[in-house]
Structures are given as structure tokens and as C-alpha cells.
Amino acid sequence: GGVSIMTVSENVMGRRARYIFLAYVWFALILVLAAFTSVASSVFVSTPTAATLSLIYMPLALFFGLLVYRFGVRISYATLVTLVLIILAIFYSLNYPTYLTYEAWAVILAFYSFLAAGLPVWYLLQPRDYLNAYLLWAFVGVALFTSVLTFDLALQGPIYTKFAVSGAVIGALPGTTPAKMDIAYFWPVVPLVIACGALSGFHSVVASGTTSKQLANELDALFVGFGAMLTEGAVSSLAVILPIAVAWNFASLQAATGLPVLEALSKGGVDVSKMTEIIQLGAVDRFTNGYGLAVATALSRIFGPSQYIDIFLGFKTFAAWALSAFILTTLDTANRLARFAWREMFDWLEDRSRTTYKILTNRWVASAIPPILALILAYPKIDVIVPETGAKLSVYAYSMLWPAFSGTNQLLAALALLTGALWVYFVLGVRGRISWLILAPALFLWLTVTAALVMWLVFIMPYLPVLYQAGAGTIIAISLILDIMLIMLFVKAFRKSV
């Protein structure tokens, strides 16, 4: 059961659309791999205990897969045994952090994504995703419990900040011209900042090509697909609202609660003399510190203020664990999808040169190319001088890659939604006003993300280091060309269907 969104595009827009879609997906997945390799490497550098747990977590997932699929152990028993081992691994990792450089982690993660993409899905991907579900529910459950215990606190974050902010938000390096200008307008550049699974082209590829094939019944698609998006929306809302609502201004939170907020942050590595608001922290630190502060503020009402710092440090680490677990999920899944897209792109070659086709589409060859290209983009740290202070600042690759990845991902979502709109027209035969329920948001999303990527290409890309101009800049340019080609095919097909 189930076909990929690329196959659906062929059915409603023609064979050319399928190959254009496949090429777009493949290039987009390169940016996904590069961005998440960089993010994961930075998380492991800043939280070495998360690195240790992740290193242990993978063999445990392999162990679970072997128990269930090779030795026939019941899932409930295998789950119980593996979860106990994971809990033991958590305590072990707290005492034995793994210290490696950012560059070393980038190489290790690239090799991991290569290995995971080539292995059978039951061997690592499926068991690890299954075990991650327990971590997700624990993460969300703690967040929900926290929101209940802190509902009486006054909101810290402002309802409105600014419609336009510095170009640094969308990847401009400190000291460059776009970083000094308020050119990052909320519309249309918000999809270059927020790359959430609640609106994600990457997820459309996973859902249509992988998840759909695992459904027992087509009727389950509504519960699994729509239910997953509702859950993802809830998670994204908690991730954004809870830390900002509770911990926007550190001094204000300390004054309102009487808790040692500033001391806790200092012990967690935050320079509170310079960083007074959570928005001033980097993306990863914003997430981990915000989650830690929110949970510590809530649980200190149960365990007392004396435990505040320990609770904060513990749940800051827990947030890093959760983040790294889902980043690794993205890495191996993205590379596996890139491998499939690569193979499908060359299926026309099978009848013309079978030997060449076999070499190009070999599972290990197809699994190696994307992480190698991603590693080239993710590997370097860029050292820049902040003009205002003269301080030397090391900028991780994801700061520059994230807007490019985010934009291509959201544009893929728009293209998938437009393909879905044509499917509604062709297959379901839906006409009239109700058809605009899918067509209107798809067109608005396409216009928004296309405009945002053009802005990034014009205003940000020329000021990036040469590597990112040649790498991310070229990928975005190619993606926009493919985007225009697909929208032309969409218009042509839509006219035929009307």
C-alpha cells in the first residue's frame, strides 16, 4: 500500500514532474542532512552527556530489533528490557560524558547516517523510532505537567516584538551588511526560521513513501496522519510558548518566583551579565535552557527551592537528550529517503545501461553521496569578529544553513500540498468552493516560501563565506528553478482538470 508524493505528482502532472520532484527532494535532503549534522554536533559539544547517551542508544536499538525480529521475543518484553537498559544508560552518561570536537562529531554523524541508510529498516530505523516515542511522550508529559504547575505565573514574553529584525535571524554573519539591517520581515521570511514538523515537506515524503506502506488499513491514514500532525502541532506549541512564557527575562523570573534563576543559569554555562533574555541565546541553548528553567520553576513548588539548580541542570540535559535523539532520527531517515530518491532518479537508465545503473544505485553508493556532500557544508566552524565588541565568535555551520534548509523544506511542503490539490481534483473529483480548502493555503504557502528564498538568495547569500555561496547558494538556486518548473506543470495540469 501507499505511494510516494513523487509518484502522485507523476499521476497528476506527468512523468516529467516526477523527475523534477525527485531532484528537488534530493537537493532538499542534502540541506536537511547538513543542517542537522551541524546542530547535532553542536549539541554534543555543549552537552557531552547527551553524546554518551546517544552512543549507547544506537546499540540498544539494534538489540531491540534483534530481540523482536530475529529471536521472536514479544514486543512488550523486549520494550521493558530495553527501557530498563536505557534508564541505566542515562545514569551512566551522567557520570561519563564524551568530549570530542565539533569537527569530530560531524564526521561521526555523517558516517552514522551513511550506515543507517544502508541497513534494513527493521535493523535500526524502526526500533530506534519506536523507542524514541517513549522519550517523546516523557518530554511532552513533563512539559504538560509543567504548564499546569506554572499557569498562575505572569507571562514574561511580549505579545509583539518587531515585524522586521536583523538579517542575522536568517543566516547573515555578525558584522556583515545584512546583519546590520532590519531586512528579515516576518512575512515572508518566517518559514526560513521555523522548520517545524507541523508544516514540513520532509514529513510529506516520509508519510507518503514510508508511513503509508506500514498501515494495516487505508482507513488508519486519517488517525495516523492527521493525528500525528495534531500531536506535532501540540509539541511545537509547547516548545515555543512554554519557555518564552515562563523564562523570557531571567531577572524578572527570579524576582517573580524568588528562585535562584541567575545562579542556575551561570552553573549551566550562561553568561548572565551579557545574556539577560532567552532570545539572546543561540537556538539550541534557547531550547535547552528554556525547558530547564520552566521545569525547574514548576517542580521546585513540589520539592522546594533548594532543589531548583539541580532540577534545572538535570532537565536542561534531558532536553538536550530529547533534541539529539530526534536529530539522529532525522539524519538517518533523511539519508534513507535521499537514497531512495537517488535510485528513482536513475530508473530510466536501467534499460539503457544496466551495469551503470547497478553501480549508481548500489545501496552503499547511494547512501554515501548525500552525507559526504552534507559533511562538506556542515564541517567548518566560521570564526568572525563582532564589530561592536571586537570579540572573536565561532559560528556553527547551522547558523548559515538553517534558513536554506528551512526554506527548501517548507517549499517542499507547498509543492506537496499543491500536488495534493490536483489529486483532490483528478482522483476525488472535488469541485467548487470546498476545493479551495486545500488550494488556497497551498498557493499562499508557495508564494510565501518562494519569496522568502528569493530574498535569502539576493540579500544574505552574497555575504556568506565562499563555501556556502557555492554549496547552499547553488542548491537554493537549483531548487528555485525546479520550483518554477513544477509550478508551471501544476498550472498546466490544473487547467486541464477545470
Spans of features found by a protein language model:
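Hydrophobic alpha-helical segments and their helix-loop junctions in multi-pass secondary transporters
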Residues: G65-R70, R74, V84-V107, L115-A117, ...
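C-terminal membrane-solvent junction of multi-pass transporters and transport-like membrane proteins
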Residues: T47-S54, F64-L85, T101-Y102, L131-N132, ...
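Selective recognition of specific alpha-helical transmembrane segments in multi-pass small-molecule
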Residues: V25, I30-A34, V84-L85, A89, ...
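Helix-loop-helix module between adjacent transmembrane segments
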Residues: G1, I5-A78, I86-W105, A195-S200, ...
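Flexible loop linkers connecting adjacent transmembrane helices
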Residues: G1-A17, T210-D220, V224, F250-L265, ...
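Hydrophobic, membrane-embedded alpha-helices of multi-pass small-molecule transporters
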Residues: Y102-L119, F145-L153, T176-A216, V224-F226, ...
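Loop-to-transmembrane helix boundary motifs in multi-pass membrane proteins
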Residues: V12-I30, G227-A234, F287, I309-A319, ...
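Extracellular/periplasmic helix-exit of transmembrane alpha-helices
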Residues: S147-T176, L230-L293, T333, A378-A391
